[in-house]
Swiss-Prot record:
Primary site of residence: membrane
Reaction catalyzed: Fe(3+)(out) + ATP + H2O = Fe(3+)(in) + ADP + phosphate + H(+)
Lineage of producing organism: Bacteria, Pseudomonadati, Pseudomonadota, Betaproteobacteria, Neisseriales
Descriptive protein name: Fe(3+) ions import ATP-binding protein FbpC
Enzyme Commission (EC) number: 7.2.2.7
Taxonomic source organism: Neisseria gonorrhoeae
GO cellular component, one term: plasma membrane
Top enzyme class: translocase
Length: 352
């Protein structure tokens, strides 16, 4: 199978400051990839290099087997087949929604029957058929997002590129537009690259996630693999919350840390020192011990919240704050037992 997108050893600097450092990844046909990372990690620059708005210093980019950038090739933007929705606004404010989508076909008119059929199909696909005669200033932010996607899909691009497409929308509208946009992409069989800083969004909608830090890709994997079998401590901390401790491995598949001796998931040899990570959802709190891994603790404070209870407690010399969706009614100062569900993750050589 020919990759929808292939990036090989791509690098880019601005004024001798590296922004992209040896980036390599690929995207299968119909696959949705989310690139996530903190602000300034290089994810938007990577997207701009893919779109042809920035020229990389080295490396190569190919689209469905066709090289669009390499040492000897640099196709102009007009000769590539990317779709890049200008999210949040229509590109031609004096044209109707229908004409804006026709603009994506190159002439802004929809002259032929085939073009008109394509425009109608994109209006229906993105749920805006009833808006065809309106102008951009008559649309809400969410409606403009749909127009932008319909216009980008109209010329049937091989790949859609989206840079923080939902950031300007309120939470409720963002959720609806996001689900509709993902559904439209999948219904149209399009590969897509999303740039986002929203880890929950990526975990829910991506086929694969690439985590970036300081111009490098730390790991590219499915959401499940990235969350459950992370290859890098920085990646796992960005993709989800975690409680970390310095630790040392034992020969029996456990590690010693400030919470005591805990089971771990690691293939490193005994004596290896590193960092132990426990996901918050692995903890549950009970008044009594049980035949599982138990950590004795003292409840310092409980604070009921809307969807969970915030509990501060002391285990030995360590103070933990946990947000538990369901927790027994416990008075401050009472002794309780933390249960650990499953092994902790261990990262050799990562010391705090």
């Amino acid at each position: 199978m020919t990759a929808a997108l292939h990036i090989g050893h791509l690098s880019k600097s601005f004024q001798n400051t590296p922004v992209l450092n040896d980036i390599s990844l690929s995207l299968d046909p119909g696959e949705i990839l989310f690139i996530i990372g903190a602000s300034g990690c290089g994810k938007t620059t990577l997207l701009r290099c893919l779109a042809g708005f920035e020229q990389p210093d080295s490396g190569e980019i190919s689209l469905s087997g066709k090289t669009i950038f390499s040492k000897n090739t640099n196709l102009p933007v007009r000769e590539t087949t990317f779709g890049l929705p200008r999210t949040g606004r229509c590109s031609v404010p004096h044209l109707t929604v229908y004409r804006n989508i026709a603009y994506g076909l190159g002439n802004g008119k929809g002259r032929t029957a085939q073009e008109r059929q394509r425009i109608e199909a994109m209006l229906e696909l993105t749920g805006i058929s009833e808006l065809a005669g309106r102008y951009p200033h008559e649309l809400s932010g969410g409606q403009q997002q749909r127009v932008a996607l319909a216009r980008a899909l109209a010329p049937d691009p091989e790949l859609i590129l989206l840079d923080e497409p939902f950031s300007a929308l309120d939470e409720q509208l963002r959720r609806q537009i996001r689900e509709d946009m993902i559904a439209a992409l999948r219904a149209n069989g399009k590969s897509a690259v999303f740039v986002s800083h929203d880890r929950e969004e990526a975990l829910q909608y991506a086929d694969r996630i690439a985590v970036m830090k300081q111009g490098r890709i730390l790991q590219t994997a499915s959401p499940h693999e990235l969350y459950r079998q992370p290859a890098d401590l920085d990646a796992v901390l960005f993709i989800g919350e975690g409680i970390v401790f310095p630790a040392a491995l034992n020969a029996d598949g456990t590690a010693d840390c400030r919470l005591g001796r805990l089971p771990v998931q690691s293939g490193a040899p005994a004596g290896t020192r590193g960092t132990l990570l426990i996901r918050p959802e692995q903890f549950s709190l009970h008044p009594h011990s049980a035949p599982v891994v138990s950590i004795h603790a003292v409840v310092l404070k409980t604070t009921p919240k809307a969807r969970y209870t915030e509990i501060s407690l002391r285990a030995g010399q360590t103070v933990l704050t946990l947000n538990l969706p369901s927790a027994p009614t416990l008075s401050d100062g009472i002794s309780a037992v933390l249960h650990l569900d499953g092994p902790a993750l261990f990262f050799p050589g990562n010391t705090l």
